[in-house]
Structures are given as C-alpha cells and as structure tokens.
Design a protein with these regions (language model features):
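Short, low-complexity patches enriched in S/T/P/G
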Residues: 437-447
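Sequence/structural segment immediately N-terminal to covalent heme-attachment motifs in c-type
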Residues: 30-51, 55, 59-65, 157-161, ...
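Axial heme c-ligation environment in periplasmic c-type cytochrome domains
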Residues: 58, 72-86, 97-122, 143-147, ...
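Sec/Tat-exported extracytoplasmic proteins
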Residues: 43-44, 49-52, 80, 96-104, ...
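C-type cytochrome heme c attachment motif
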Residues: 38-50, 74-75, 90-98, 109-112, ...
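Post-cleavage N-terminal segment of exported redox proteins
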Residues: 2-32, 71-74, 95, 100-103, ...
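Active-site substrate-binding loop specific to GH73 endo-beta-N-acetylglucosaminidase modules
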Residues: 58-65, 69, 199-248
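Short, solvent-exposed loop/turn and secondary-structure capping segments
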Residues: 50-51, 56-62, 104-107, 138-145, ...
Length: 477
C-alpha cells in the first residue's frame, strides 16, 4: 500500500510541478500554442480584453456597461507587471474556470467563467500555452473597475460563486452524436452563448430553466435562440444558422449588431465549418421554455414595404416634434437614403430590409432603439458593415433626441414590424444610458444595513442582560 502511494506520487509529482511552474520555465510546442489560439478565438477573448478605440490586443481597457455599473476589462497579456505573465497554470485555470485572480481576489462574472468552467484540463493547458507564449506582452496598466459600494467588495463574489458557479467539466452524452456533443461543449463553454441569450435572475445569475430564451445584455437584447418556431429560431435551417454565425447576416431575417456583431467579427467567422455546424446542431436542439403562444408569424415574417411620404410631402418638417407623421419624416430624412423609401433595403442585402427583420419585429423594442442610438459595426472576411449611430457619439451623423428616437422607433414598429409595441422617450433614455440597471446594489446595501442593525441590537441585548445581572439585588437568608 505504501509502495503504491509512493509510485502514485512519483508519477503525479512531475505533472504537478509543471502545473505550478511559471510559463517562462516551459517551452510549449507550436501545435499546442495554435490550439490555444483557436480556443481563445472561440472564447472571444480579444473582443472584451481589447479597447476597440486603438487599444493593443488583449491589453484590456474596454469599458463595459453592466446593470451594476461600468466594468473595465483587464490586461491578459503575459506582461509580468501588468498582465498575467507571472501566473502559474493552476492560477490561470482558477481565473478562467473559477473566476479567481492570481492574487486570490474574485473576478466579476462579466468574465464568463461560469461558462468556461466546463472546459477540459487539456483545453485550459492549450489556452495557457497560447497566452504565455503566443500573445505579445503589453506593459501597460489597464484602468481599474470601480463599482459602487458594496459591489466594489470583491469578496462578496465568494457567496455568489457558491450559489451559482458550476464546478463540473463537460462530459459527453453517450445518447447524442459526436457533433452534438462538440456543439454543446463549444456553445455552453467557450462560445458562452447563455451568457447573453439567457435571462438573469434577481442576483444576476443565469436562469437555467429559461436557457437561451433571450436576455438583456447592456443596451441590446439577445433574442430567443431555442428551437421555438415562433419566438426562437426553430424556423431556421442548419445551413441558415451556420451562414448567420459566419457572416452575421441572414437576408430577410436578421443582422448581428452589438455584442453579437463582435462575436461574429472576432470569433465565429474564424471557426471551422465543422465547429459551426456542431454549434448549430446543438443550439437547434435546445427546447424552449417560453410560455408564450407558439403559433403565428415569426419575428422574421412580419411587416411589409410601404411609406407615408404622401401624407407630409410639401408640409413643414416635424423634427423635434411628436406629430402624427414625425417618425415618418425622420425616417425619410435620415434612413431612406440607405434602406429605401419603403424600407426595402438594397438588392445585395448590404443595407437590409426593415420588414421581415428580427430587429423591428421582436418581442420587445430594445434592438430597434439601440440600433438607432448605437448603429452597427461588423467586420467579416468579405465586408465591413457599418451603420452610423444617431445617439450622443462624436461620429453620429445626426444626434437625435429621445422624442425623435421614440417617434422614429414607433414608425418603424408600426409600419414594418411588431405594431403591438410602443416606445416612449423614457424607454430611449434607458437604452441611451447603457440598458436597464439592477436593483441588486440597493438590495445589497439594505441587506448589509439590516445585518449591521441586527448585530447592534444583539450586542445591545447582551450588554443590557449582563448589566441587569450585575445590578440585580442578592437575596440573603
């Protein structure tokens, strides 16, 4: 028994020392580094850890709006001073899969370690090799995240992790095909689809019972991508979903914008056809938990060509007003030159039709508002798709106010999409500020206040009880 233990230790010790050794002491093969590069691409690391305004790859500095405040992405280059260059492989694995930094501090789940927790040891090893020896070190400090109290106390994430962080590495389902299993591994892990497409609970945790049924992600809404034929993408073919992942567009159906445009630009278009097909196979098998009616027109079939120009041609322009035709006038002045006077788009699909379009016919108006305010910027191998923003940005062609955006949104919805929706200027302001805010900060403050009050009352009770015992008269015989 003792000899078996000694032999086991002798075999395991070298691996343990390799895991704990700094990367500089190891030499990784080109094949392993390339595998890690591919996995990092599938994980979309560069999209979040690079400032898109001239930043260096993986050096951090990207500002990301979240329901609890602005989060800054970190430097994950192998810089020993400002990045992760001094991380052992074990520390790297803990950061990726457990959300714990090399110094022991907790990461915020804006880093999708909840999804990455399913990644295998072999893939973590490949990622480590790539980040240590395949990424150029950048010796620049990224701006720090400064969330409001008490979210700025990173130790608070320990309790969140105990409740909501999975601890199981992916295991293949023997009842499913190899392609399905590969697709699930990528979709639920590296590609972290549920991070955006699954709604969040009170504590900002993914509601797994509503997996992939749609969720708010900053100023955008990641729609239902289950196999629901009406609310999801159950009407899409395998080839259509693969095309969308690779190009970011599907004519007369959908166009990628916001975080999805980034995912296409930096990740999906660079994956192999085999992996894209695997992801599509798995995603198209995910059942819907949406309680809404599953019959009727899909969000890809609503609306028709048309315009209201005859109603106001020759009249006074209604910019800044909320008149009956204000939305149509704003559309004619700012949108029709690209999308067409009847919103039919262009024949090559570069400028999409605004009817038979998921953005205008979705279950909510978020993406209509956000597309107007933030525009679209998507890079693929064959083209650069760009729609200028109409919000507060310096590159906005025209800066529309909330009333104007609401008027334009309502015109687009009524004329070309989901005419059951109505947008108010207040709705526009929410999206302008980066999306709905969570009451989690206030709840945490109230909870901490209640806890402190309870402790104070308990201490006061103890002191009062002890003082009574000391002052209580002693009875003598």
């Amino acid at each position: 028994m003792i000899m078996k233990t000694v032999k086991s230790f002798a075999l395991a010790a070298p691996l343990a020392f390799v895991t704990l050794a700094p990367a500089a002491a190891q030499e990784f093969s080109k094949e392993l580094i390339e595998k890690g590069r591919y996995l990092a691409t599938a994980s979309d690391c560069v999209a979040c850890h690079t400032n898109h305004d001239g930043g260096k790859p993986m050096a951090g500095g990207l500002s990301m709006a979240s329901p609890v405040g602005t989060i800054m992405s970190t430097n994950i280059t192998p810089s020993k001073q400002f990045g992760i260059g001094s991380y052992s492989e074990a520390q790297f694995a803990d950061a990726v899969r457990k959300g714990v930094r090399g110094d022991g501090a907790n990461l915020y789940p804006a880093m999708p370690y909840v999804s990455y927790s399913n990644m295998t040891d072999e893939d973590i090893h490949a990622l480590y090799a790539y980040f240590m020896q395949g990424v150029e070190p950048v010796d620049e400090k990224a701006p720090e995240t400064k969330l409001p109290f008490p979210m700025n106390i990173r130790a608070s994430m320990m309790g969140w992790n105990l409740l909501f962080r999975p601890n199981e590495v992916h295991k293949d389902d023997p009842n499913q095909s190899a392609e399905w299993n590969r697709g699930k591994y990528l979709a639920e892990g590296a590609a972290h689809c549920s991070t955006c497409h699954t709604p969040r609970g009170v504590f900002m945790q993914e509601q797994k019972s509503l997996n992939l049924t749609g969720g708010q992600i900053g100023a955008w809404y990641a729609p239902d991508i289950t196999n629901d034929p009406v609310h999801g993408i159950g009407s899409w073919t395998q080839a259509e979903l693969v095309t969308y992942l690779k190009t970011g567009k599907l004519e007369n159906k959908a166009q990628a914008a916001g975080s999805m445009a980034e995912a296409v630009s930096y990740s999906f278009q660079h994956l192999t056809d085999a992996d894209l097909n695997a992801i599509a196979t798995y995603v198209r098998s995910v059942p819907s938990a949406n309680a809404a009616e599953t019959t009727g027109a899909t969000r890809f079939d609503k609306g028709a060509a048309g315009n209201e120009m005859a109603a106001f041609r020759g009249g006074k322009y209604a910019e800044g007003m909320a008149g009956d035709h204000a939305g149509a006038q704003i559309f004619a002045a700012n949108c029709a030159s690209c999308h067409g006077t009847s919103a039919q788009g262009t024949k090559d699909g570069y400028y999409p039709s605004l009817f038979h379009n998921a953005a205008t016919a979705g279950d909510n108006s978020v993406n209509v508002i956000s597309a107007i305010l933030n525009g679209v910027d998507r890079h693929t191998e064959n083209e650069h798709v760009f729609m200028p923003p109409f919000g507060d940005q310096t590159n906005a062609v025209v800066q529309l106010n909330n009333v104007e955006v609401a008027s334009l949104s309502n015109y687009l919805l009524a004329q070309y999409g989901n005419d059951k929706l109505t947008v108010t200027p207040e709705d526009v302001q929410v999206i302008r500020e980066g999306g709905p805010k969570s009451n989690m900060v206030q709840m945490a403050r109230i909870g901490m206040g209640a806890g402190v009050t309870a402790v104070v009352l308990l201490l006061a009770s103890v002191i009062w009880y002890r003082s009574r015992r000391k002052t209580k008269p002693t009875l003598s015989a």
